[in-house]
């Protein structure tokens, strides 16, 4: 079996198994691919090895893959999920004073708090907001409507860093960055804002 059961591209996990031929060699492969790993079975017929997930190819959604391990006469298979790391909110434009959005996050793993770190146009951290807790093997979060700017903002381009750390660091991994520009009022209209990129 594999632990955990869901991975980002090149994520690291643990492959374990039992009931194989003691002291024999094992090989592993993904369905439709060549061999991806080999090793030696211990004297009790057990396998314990590091697993590196393949690269995720696509733009959205999880994929289910099958990993097979064999020592020749015995074959064991297990499935796991491969996911992208995504974060988004909608609507993507509106008056920042009143804009309420629904966040969608995928890929941070199960049972993690999800945090949005608000980096102001001057590059300084303004606020960190916890928006919920992930669930499921791959870490899914869907929020109800919440204020996008629950504090006084300044004009310019903000950066939202989304990650699973309650403390902000520009070096946190994994993380996602989303830009949001707030424009000054003009021609009798109030301030407006919209996601960039």
What does each of the following model-derived ranges do?
Residues 1-197:
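Extracytoplasmic/secretory-pathway segments with low complexity and glycosylation-like composition
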């Amino acid at each position: 079996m594999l632990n955990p059961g869901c991975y980002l591209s090149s994520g690291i996990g643990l492959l374990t198994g039992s009931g194989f031929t003691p002291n024999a060699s094992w090989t592993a492969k993904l369905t439709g691919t060549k061999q991806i790993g080999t090793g030696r079975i211990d004297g009790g017929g057990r396998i314990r090895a590091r697993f590196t997930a393949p690269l995720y190819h696509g733009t959205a959604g999880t994929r289910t893959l099958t990993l097979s391990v064999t020592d020749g006469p015995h074959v064991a298979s297990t499935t796991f999920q491969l996911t992208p790391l995504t974060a988004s909110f909608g609507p993507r434009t509106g008056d920042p004073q009143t804009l309420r959005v629904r966040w969608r996050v995928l890929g941070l793993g199960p049972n993690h708090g999800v945090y949005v770190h608000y980096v102001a146009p001057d590059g300084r951290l303004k606020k960190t907001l916890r928006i919920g807790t992930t669930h499921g093997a791959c870490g899914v979060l869907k929020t109800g409507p919440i204020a996008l700017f629950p504090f006084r903002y300044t004009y310019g381009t903000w950066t939202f860093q989304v990650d699973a750390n309650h403390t902000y660091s520009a070096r946190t991994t994994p993380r996602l960055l989303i830009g949001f520009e707030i424009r000054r009022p003009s021609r009798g209209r109030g301030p407006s804002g919209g996601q960039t990129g």
